[in-house]
Amino acid sequence: MQKILQTDDITDNQVLRKRKRKRTETANSENANSALEKAQRDPYSGNAFLPGESSSDEETPLMELSKEELCNKIESLKEKLRSIRKENSRLRQSLVMLQVLPQAVTQFEELVGMAETLLKSGGAVSTPASTLWRATNNSSPDSFASLCSNSNSTSSSPSSVKAEEEQHPGEKQFTIERWQIARCNKSKPQKFINDLMQVLYTNEYMATHSLTGAKSSTSRDKVVKPAMNQNEVQEIIGVTKQVFPSADDVSIRRMIGQKLNNCTKKPNASKAPNSQDGILK
């Protein structure tokens, strides 16, 4: 009787093991089929990008793995995590480059415009005074050095001085370059004119000149200031109306005068570190 009971227990244990093994195999098979179907539906999602990914890792439950196998699996997951972080860092750098690229293109266009301006002014016989005033406040110091060297080389002899005096009435047409407009604040007309005149002239020039040359009734200065070149004033008005079509000539001239008055009230502003007025003296 005891042998029969022992035989029944052994048989029951074998049946239980077979059932457990069958359930495990069925579950693993279902998981493998599910993963295969998911990969077929969306081959580019999830872990499809991870290198060395194999479905064999999921075939064995973690509970049945040895300590060494678990350690190897953890190391493998850490390596994959490091790879993902490196890829994320590379993608962030690419995104930053794409964000900075438009600004770099704009700055490159400005440099091209400055180079074209220097090439045009380099072929002139003499450098007009108004051009020197504008060059002292440009962003590139090389432009001022180039203009000064050109002026010194052409005005070293009396004949060149006479040629400059003869050429002054027929001075080259005043033009505002695109890179100069790009540097200006375009939120309001007054801010645009302030920035544009700051690019074109130095503070000392604006402090010693007026819009029309007539003495203002509200001005405290006893000395009448010389008028700005009216061709330059019209050019500034034209450019401002291109940026702000609703602005009219009267309001633009008033804004130009306001900028000149502000520079008059701040005579020491021309002694800023970025000013090169001492060179002109």
UniProtKB/Swiss-Prot annotation:
Protein origin, superkingdom: Eukaryota
Biased composition (Basic and acidic residues): 162-172
Annotated coiled-coil segments of the chain: 19-99
Biological process according to GO: negative regulation of Notch signaling pathway; nervous system development; positive regulation of neuron differentiation
Keywords tagged on the record: Coiled coil, Neurogenesis, Nucleus, Repressor, Transcription, Transcription regulation
Molecular function in Gene Ontology: chromatin binding; DNA binding; transcription corepressor activity
Ranges of biased composition (kind: Low complexity): 143-160
Biological role: Acts as a corepressor of recombining binding protein suppressor hairless (RBPJ) and inhibits Notch signaling in neural stem cells, thereby opposing their self-renewal and promoting neurogenesis.
Protein name: BEN domain-containing protein 6
